[in-house]
């Protein structure tokens, strides 16, 4: 099994990376592509292992998910401008959504399909360390280490941190906040309005390359930095190269 996740600030190019890899695998045609996002949008739940075909698989997923707690996060908690949800509610919701996906779907699937399984993710526990961990630092004045420990103490996060970290994480980097804002204006669907202000985009973008975060991550996974400031083609090429590096070795 190979598990690769793409991370980065909003409008930073994660979607471009995932689409490029999905198209690459579709063109190869030697594996079945199972898009969990599409399944969740259609059926309103996580798939269980028996619903995956018995063939070489590429499984694609996103966090938050599009079902259950993840849908609540997308539709209400991240977008509700009338209610300022506490960082605790936000962090615990993400952690529960994460644990349900891995317990209901991936744990059994990995046992069944260990040799012929490639998993491609958009966001994961690193987003919780950056987004909710960053909120804890900015709102309470806690140190990075204190915020990290608080995030990782939540059962769903601890479960994933100790049992299901990806083999590699591709972090898209865009240092020009004006470019991020321009991309945001051009994008029709916005997933988390409260994090898409210029102030938050700057703070979050810096956190993804913070030496303390990267030091923690390097103990658990391999980090691949993607220069996403240039052309779409350049971003896609880097993403595919990372994917091939881990899935075709």
Predicted regions and their residues:
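Hydrophobic anchor at the beta1->P-loop junction of P-loop NTPases
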Residues: 6
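Short glycine-/polar-rich loops that comprise or flank the Walker A/P-loop
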Residues: 56, 164-168, 219-222
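Conserved lysine of the Walker
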Residues: 14
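Walker A (P-loop) phosphate-binding loop of P-loop NTPases
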Residues: 11
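NTP-dependent small-molecule kinase module
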Residues: 20-24, 28-29, 178-249
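ATP-dependent small-molecule kinase phosphotransfer cores
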Residues: 40-153
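A glycine- and Lys/Arg-enriched "phosphate-lid" helix/loop adjacent to the NTP-binding pocket
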Residues: 127-207
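Walker A (P-loop) ATP-phosphate-binding motif of ABC ATPase nucleotide-binding domains
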Residues: 3
